[in-house]
């Protein structure tokens, strides 16, 4: 696969993952903060605050998980390099 095509696929996957995260966040926060039967067309103060906190927490956790996964991936790469170096040519 040529580098340009690989870059395009990576960009498409990133967009798909971001859309999925947005949809899951929206659904989870809506379920948590907005009652199934609306009383008014506008969000109440409590609903608005709940949604703000929910989205903030969701994004914070997503960022923390991303950093941790990157860290673990880098550790795995280092371990693989060490294993390859130690089992080098015989």
Curated annotation (Swiss-Prot):
Pfam families: zf-Tim10_DDP. It is a peripheral membrane protein. A motif (Twin CX3C motif) lies at residues 29-54. It is found in: Mitochondrion inner membrane. Gene3D superfamilies: Mitochondrial import inner membrane translocase subunit tim13 like domains (1.10.287.810). One of its GO terms (cellular component) is mitochondrial intermembrane space protein transporter complex. GO terms for molecular function: membrane insertase activity; protein homodimerization activity; protein-folding chaperone binding; zinc ion binding. Ubiquitous, with highest expression in heart, kidney, liver and skeletal muscle. One of its GO terms (biological process) is protein insertion into mitochondrial inner membrane. Keywords: Chaperone, Disulfide bond, Membrane, Metal-binding, Mitochondrion, Mitochondrion inner membrane, Protein transport, Translocation, Transport, Zinc. SUPFAM superfamilies: Tim10-like. The keyword Ubl conjugation does not apply. Disulfide bonds join 29-54, 33-50. Heterohexamer; composed of 3 copies of TIMM9 and 3 copies of TIMM10/TIM10A, named soluble 70 kDa complex. The complex forms a 6-bladed alpha-propeller structure and associates with the TIMM22 component of the TIM22 complex. Interacts with multi-pass transmembrane proteins in transit. Also forms a complex composed of TIMM9, TIMM10/TIM10A and FXC1/TIM10B. Belongs to the small Tim family. The twin CX3C motif contains 4 conserved Cys residues that form 2 disulfide bonds in the mitochondrial intermembrane space. However, during the transit of TIMM10 from cytoplasm into mitochondrion, the Cys residues probably coordinate zinc, thereby preventing folding and allowing its transfer across mitochondrial outer membrane. Mitochondrial intermembrane chaperone that participates in the import and insertion of multi-pass transmembrane proteins into the mitochondrial inner membrane. May also be required for the transfer of beta-barrel precursors from the TOM complex to the sorting and assembly machinery (SAM complex) of the outer membrane. Acts as a chaperone-like protein that protects the hydrophobic precursors from aggregation and guide them through the mitochondrial intermembrane space. This is Mitochondrial import inner membrane translocase subunit Tim10. The gene is TIMM10.
